[in-house]
Amino acid sequence: MKPTTISQLRRLKETGKKFATITAYDFSFAKLFEEEGIGVMLVGDSLGMTVQGHDSTLPVTVDDIAYHTRAVRRGAPHCLLLADLPFMAYATPEQAFENSAAVMRAGANMVKIEGGQWLADTVRMLTERAVPVCGHLGLTPQSVNIFGGYKVQGRDEAAAQTLLNDALALEAAGAQLLVLECVPVALAQRITNALSIPVIGIGAGNVTDGQILVMHDAFGITGGHIPKFAKNFLAEAGDMRAAVRQYIAEVESGAYPGEEHSFH
């Protein structure tokens, strides 16, 4: 198996072919995901909730991310591996560079950071120093205390325009990918069409170039509130490997996410 690259994802965008990605936190699931055809994985700070049992992502540290990144890389040596920089790990460009180095030494190919055009200088600095960056806009969980909860973003025109401007600014600064979370389908379409870099959606309809799900949502083992955009593929498929294959197939065909998983 050849490694998945950002160039391959760009070609998929150019040819209109969708791709599936998923969060991974350990060796065994990462190995399963790669064996069943997932080429892009994220060691997300969502591990604070799904693995550590916190009520938000805020307690997660760089050391936590690095630990899980090493485990995932051992299980999936060929995947394009993204790693979140957690809360307050990129408050300054210098801090972002130091912490990016830590997670890349652990095996990440790219770091993901949450925020808009105010991060352009950080993205530019990291890119110039050979650290590929994935942006993250819309509902950014590290900002949950600012948003007042987990809410759909960009529903009015002013907010939508701000998100579009943020996306363009991140791309201009050198971002290689963009995650777009919990935004109306029409806005996701505008942003996906406006950018030359691949856009990965979660709660953004089936109009983005790729999709990502938290693995616990895909297997129906999330405790507490289940997001509208989540689908339990395990319930339909019957076993984990078949569930992963079904997830990939439905993303590639555009069947998932459906209208019932989308916001307007």
From Swiss-Prot:
Protein name as catalogued: 3-methyl-2-oxobutanoate hydroxymethyltransferase
Cofactor note (record): Binds 1 Mg(2+) ion per subunit.
Cofactor: Mg(2+)
Keyword Cell division applies: no
Record's catalysed reaction(s): 3-methyl-2-oxobutanoate + (6R)-5,10-methylene-5,6,7,8-tetrahydrofolate + H2O = 2-dehydropantoate + (6S)-5,6,7,8-tetrahydrofolate
Pathway(s) it belongs to: Cofactor biosynthesis; (R)-pantothenate biosynthesis; (R)-pantoate from 3-methyl-2-oxobutanoate: step 1/2
Keyword Hydrolase belongs to the record: no
Gene Ontology terms: cellular component: cytoplasm
Function (record text): Catalyzes the reversible reaction in which hydroxymethyl group from 5,10-methylenetetrahydrofolate is transferred onto alpha-ketoisovalerate to form ketopantoate.
Active site, per annotation: E181 (proton acceptor)
Residues reported in the UniProt entry to bind 3-methyl-2-oxobutanoate: D45, S46, D84, K112
This protein's encoding gene: panB
Main location, first listed in the record: cytoplasm
Family of the protein in this entry: Belongs to the PanB family.
Compartmental location: Cytoplasm
Enzyme class label: transferase
Subunit structure: Homodecamer; pentamer of dimers.
CDD domains per the UniProt record, alphabetical: KPHMT-like
Alphabetized Pfam families for the sequence: Pantoate_transf
PANTHER family noted in UniProt: 3-METHYL-2-OXOBUTANOATE HYDROXYMETHYLTRANSFERASE (PTHR20881:SF0)
Gene Ontology molecular functions: 3-methyl-2-oxobutanoate hydroxymethyltransferase activity; magnesium ion binding
UniProt KW keywords: Cytoplasm, Magnesium, Metal-binding, Pantothenate biosynthesis, Transferase
Database matches in InterPro entries: Pantoate_hydroxy_MeTrfase, Pyrv/PenolPyrv_kinase-like_dom, Pyrv_kinase-like_dom_sf
EC number: 2.1.2.11
Gene Ontology biological-process entries: pantothenate biosynthetic process
Binding site for Mg(2+): D45, D84, E114
